[in-house]
């Protein structure tokens, strides 16, 4: 499947409810996922203003499974993180470290997603 044609309802439904997400891009797959999350939630995805979103990414089963794993529930986030310490990046130049970010409205699309894979996997394990 090509991502632009990949509009599973669970992705749209879940993303529409997310206000916060925790993402760290360490490899190409996580970089891909940040593109996906950014595109589907209407949030800018990079600190390079000239970077073009790749339209023809092939989405594998592994991508889909990892993408589901990276959808962090807002309720869990609110319990896990002290909201007063939530980092909201509006200055792209400040994005240098891992941290929670609050999803800004689409009218302010300057943000970076930072996924701590271990924390997300542990959370998913708790749900089983």
Give names to the regions the model predicted.
Residues 99-128:
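C-terminal accessory extensions appended to soluble enzyme cores
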Residues 2-79, 83, 89-103:
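PAPS-dependent sulfotransferase catalytic domain
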């Amino acid at each position: 499947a090509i991502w632009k044609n990949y509009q599973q309802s669970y992705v749209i439904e879940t993303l529409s409810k997310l206000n916060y997400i925790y993402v760290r891009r360490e490899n190409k797959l996580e970089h891909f996922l940040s593109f996906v999350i950014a595109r589907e939630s209407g949030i800018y995805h990079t600190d390079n203003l000239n970077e073009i979103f790749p339209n023809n990414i092939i989405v594998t089963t592994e991508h889909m499974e990892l993408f589901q794993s990276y959808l962090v529930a807002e309720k869990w986030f609110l319990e896990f993180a002290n909201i007063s310490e939530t980092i909201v990046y509006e200055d792209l130049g400040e994005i240098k470290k891992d941290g929670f970010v609050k999803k800004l409205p689409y009218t302010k699309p300057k943000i970076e997603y930072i996924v701590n894979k271990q924390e997300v996997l542990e959370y998913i394990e708790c749900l089983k």
